[in-house]
Amino acid sequence: MAHSVSSVVNKQLLAYIKESSELMTPKDIYVCDGSAEEYHNLCELLVKQGIFTKLNETKRPNCYLARSNPADVARVEKCTYICSEKEEDAGPTNNWMAPAEMKAKLNGLMKGCMKGRTMYVIPFSMGPIGGPISRVGVEITDSPYVVVNMCIMAKVGKKVLDLLGVDGTFVPCTHSCLAPLEEGQKDSTWPCNIDNRYIVQFPEEHRIVSVGSGYGGNALLGKKCYALRIATVLSREAGDSLAEHMLILGITNPQGKKYYITAAFPSACGKTNLAMLNATIPGWKIECVGDDIAWLKIGKDGRLWAINPESGFFGVAPGTSYKSNPNAMKSCEKDTIFTNVALTEDGDVWWEGMTKEVPKGKIITWLGKEWSADSGEPKPNLAHPNSRFTARVENVPVGDPGYYALEGVPVSAMIFGGRRENTVPLVFQSRSWKHGVLLGSSVASETTAAAEAAAGQLRFDPFAMLPFCGYNMGDYFGYWLSFADKYDEAKLPKIFHVNWFRKDNGRFLWPGYGENSRVLKWIIERVEGKEGIAKETPIGYLPAKGALDLSGLDVPEADMEKILTVDCKAYLSEVEKIRQYHSKFGSLLPKALIAELDALEQRLKAAL
């Protein structure tokens, strides 16, 4: 039978299924084949169970809405662990517990936890099946919601089993909602066990176990758990690879020459918007390879090549509109799973920021409560601030053909950036690869008044990887630095830093969105070695006067002056903040990184 364990021949997988079923005692076992028919059947099952609502087939063909438990709505960093053999290998940015202690805890929670449920076995490939940068995982879960989302987010099914063959290896990813069902017991519409959430990575074993949560980032284990936390470990072991929280975009100039750029930004800095940008400058075209994760590897030619290991977008819905990101909106017009957004009277979805006006008629909020604009009741959050859409990469109208390339795409430039109201210029280029690593290690965003910390405080998020690095971040900086020693720096990507968010008296100085293509144009011209377009400053290379293409753009010269000037005095206090942050890594902070920061300080002092 196609979906029974008898269809499995891989030795590691057979042992994994046996060990999992003996511990968790499911009522039956189902091996996923990744077919459209299977997806349809599971969605129908989820509708029957009350977990999915089918949306209006005319407005949103083949789309469904799910509502989670109100307490299970986001990644939970406090419940996320890197259980390395030694505590120092997890480092100061990760939670740690001794592996033996964690396993005892998990085994206690998982004994019989799938009682009355089906155990789904999901063989998946991160990246094109059989590609040199791609890797395989198998997720075992008791959640059909996880299965259908994984079928969008990764390449699932028989081809992966064929690739594994008898002796192939994979990363085992075990997930359970920890909600066993007794005979005749009515099931919940969102099984979870909030008080027992653990999202655990065992780096030496290349193994993931996540229990208690049914939510995306905690339950779709191919995503952050594998594609970043375990993949950072695998990449360092390989010695020639990186696994990064980066978008990948293709940019073609008017002469038809194409380049690829990766970019890492902390959350709420517009990563998906940049990945799906519509360029505003004539003759330039931007296409999307991926919006969240990049796996990179040095190719035979000495260049760094990248793949998007995912096959879908798990996008934040609120704030996404036809104005802010038309391509993201088009990508979720069909074949999409929505989680925790509002349901309109005509069977469509809505979220804050989608349109100026709230739709007329009755709306069911993400909490399943009825509300309407004319009810006289104050408007609640109709969609949860972290509500999501899960859509296929193929749906995006600006998809880049490089997404399908087995060997990936060659990367010419890397961008880091944060949300900074002052000090940090619109764009600058690092002086070298090692100086670029300093930029990555000091990525930061200012907290807003809405955050718990005082407004204007810096929250550092090195490489935008703070919650996602699977080993000690000091070692991670050292591994990045090693690329300059091991490889020809001339062939490595040029590194840049951007900041779209400079303000003056509360007013943004740069229009952002599609106009950011003007900054990408300058970056590509720097990659091409165009003369006379950059000026050297203590922090790196900035656009020379007149070098940024501002044609047809109405930005006052005084504003451009502000965002393209280095305030050395303000930057010296920046250096102090970076030094203070770096001190948390103690003796594992690489000396070469300290030397880069010292040199930056000297250049700034000399320029005063």
UniProtKB/Swiss-Prot annotation:
Cofactor dependency: Mn(2+)
This protein's pathway: Carbohydrate biosynthesis; gluconeogenesis
InterPro entries: PEP_carboxykin_GTP_CS, PEP_carboxykinase_C, PEP_carboxykinase_GTP, PEP_carboxykinase_GTP_C, PEP_carboxykinase_GTP_N, PEP_carboxykinase_N
Catalytic reaction equation(s): oxaloacetate + GTP = phosphoenolpyruvate + GDP + CO2
MF-aspect GO terms: GTP binding; manganese ion binding; phosphoenolpyruvate carboxykinase (GTP) activity
Enzyme class at the top of the EC tree: lyase
Superkingdom as given in the UniProt entry: Eukaryota
EC number: 4.1.1.32
Residues reported to bind Mn(2+): 224, 245, 292
Chain sites annotated for binding substrate: 75, 215-217, 267, 386-388
Active site: 269
CDD domains associated with the record: PEPCK_GTP
A single GO BP: oxaloacetate metabolic process
Gene Ontology CC terms, in alphabetical order: cytosol
Pfam families hit by this protein: PEPCK_GTP, PEPCK_N
Details of cofactor binding: Binds 1 Mn(2+) ion per subunit.
Keywords: Decarboxylase, Gluconeogenesis, GTP-binding, Lyase, Manganese, Metal-binding, Nucleotide-binding
Subunit details: Monomer.
Function: Catalyzes the conversion of oxaloacetate (OAA) to phosphoenolpyruvate (PEP), the rate-limiting step in the metabolic pathway that produces glucose from lactate and other precursors derived from the citric acid cycle.
Family classification: Belongs to the phosphoenolpyruvate carboxykinase [GTP] family.
The protein's name: Phosphoenolpyruvate carboxykinase [GTP]
Organism: Neocallimastix frontalis
